[in-house]
Structures are given as structure tokens and as C-alpha cells.
């Protein structure tokens, strides 16, 4: 399956997340499922927490080919790593084809 998860560009206090912090996320995702595709940070969203707080986010869409269990593991890590109250991921496709060409 192909999943997309939205990773925050800023902390809840509005300060930008540093590149080196994102690199730790990238390495963890590679460890879990073998790779990731990072898209340009163009997604802006708004949501209301269970406590009634409005959050306005700018996020980085990250796509991963993995199982349901792996995306949930990635979501759990994302919540802890970025100190998030909620994490959004959604299935993009049920079918993913990867062809390897070792001779190239």
C-alpha cells in the first residue's frame, strides 16, 4: 500500500522545525519501511483539537510504501518526535509496484 503522512514544518509554538530534526524522522521511516518520498511543503491545514484549540499547520507530505501496521508505527513515532496532538495519514493506493534492476 502507498500511504501519505503529513509532517509538521513548525512546532506548536510556531518555531520552525530544524532540518536535522527532520533527518532523524527520515532515518526512522527508512528503518521501518525501507524508504520515503518527501514532497514540497505546500499543504496548509486547519483543525480543532479535542480541547477546542484551533491549530493552523503548514505540513510536508511524505509518501511511504508500507503495511498498515508500519504506517501506524510511523504515526506513533511522528507524534512523539514532533510532539503532535494528532497525526494524519491516508492511503493513496492499494497497489504499489517496485521493480529492481541490479544490472544498472
Role assignments for model-derived ranges:
Residues 1-104:
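Positively charged, small/polar-rich N-terminal and surface patches that mediate targeting and assembly
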Amino acid at each position: 500500500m502507498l500511504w501519505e503522512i503529513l509532517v509538521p514544518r513548525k512546532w506548536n509554538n510556531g518555531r520552525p522545525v530544524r532540518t536535522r530534526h527532520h533527518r532523524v524522522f527520515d532515518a526512522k521511516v527508512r528503518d521501518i519501511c525501507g524508504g520515503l518520498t518527501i514532497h514540497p511543503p505546500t499543504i496548509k491545514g486547519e483543525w480543532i483539537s479535542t480541547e477546542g484549540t484551533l491549530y493552523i499547520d503548514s505540513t510536508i507530505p511524505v509518501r511511504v510504501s508500507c503495511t498498515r501496521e508500519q504506517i501506524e508505527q510511523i504515526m506513533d513515532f511522528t507524534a512523539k518526535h514532533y510532539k503532535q496532538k494528532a497525526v494524519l495519514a491516508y492511503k493513496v493506493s492499494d497497489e504499489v509496484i517496485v521493480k529492481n534492476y541490479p544490472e544498472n
